[in-house]
Regions:
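A short, polar/charged loop-to-alpha-helix boundary motif
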Residues: 140-155
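Radical SAM enzyme [4Fe-4S]-AdoMet core and its adjacent flexible, acidic
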Residues: 1-124, 128, 137, 141, ...
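Hydrophobic "anchor" residues
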Residues: 132-133
């Protein structure tokens, strides 16, 4: 997966570096047949996510999305649930019309209002310091507010574990 968090100007703004063009060039030059893009959606980039998905369609093999988590509780990057639901409806329409969004429809629906129960022990996280954390990667780093979570990998695996075959 390669993180692409917006079209050129937005991606560069969020990353605080002029790197978008280099990221896309490296993807296009790669011989790897299955490069995937991952979009972390936030209050800055949400309006252009459908255009970003359209742009990435011919650049990568597939696309996954998740939502930014507000690490400091009052975080200007957190996208409220009304905008989240409206955007997810647009992402679902793109997926249904053939765009390579790899998130399941069940997961995209569940992320709208977070009416799902996380089974976090199913996920292991490799941390930058080399340690491994089992479960939510916020454990030990933050006070966790599951109601504001938007981590789609946790959504997918939790729905599947609980018997949702559409996840």
């Amino acid at each position: 997966w390669v993180s692409v968090d917006g079209l050129a100007q937005t991606h560069n703004q969020l990353r605080n570096a002029e790197i978008f063009d280099r990221v896309i060039e490296n993807i296009q030059r790669s011989a790897h047949p299955k490069i995937l893009a991952h979009i972390t959606i936030n209050a800055v980039n949400f309006a252009e996510v459908p255009d970003l998905i359209r742009y990435l369609r011919g650049v990568v093999k597939g696309i996954t999305v998740q939502f930014y988590y507000p690490y400091h509780r009052q975080d200007e990057l957190f996208l409220d649930f009304q905008h989240r639901a409206e955007l997810l409806d647009r992402v679902i329409r793109l997926k249904k019309s053939g765009y390579p969004v790899m998130n399941s429809l069940a997961s995209l629906e569940a992320l709208k209002e977070n009416h799902w129960t996380c089974v976090d022990w199913l996920v292991d996280c490799a941390n930058p310091d080399g340690s491994i954390t089992q479960g939510c990667y916020l454990k030990g780093h933050e006070d966790i507010d599951c109601a504001r979570c938007g981590f789609s990998p946790h959504t997918e695996i939790s729905l599947a574990y609980r018997g949702n075959l559409a996840a």
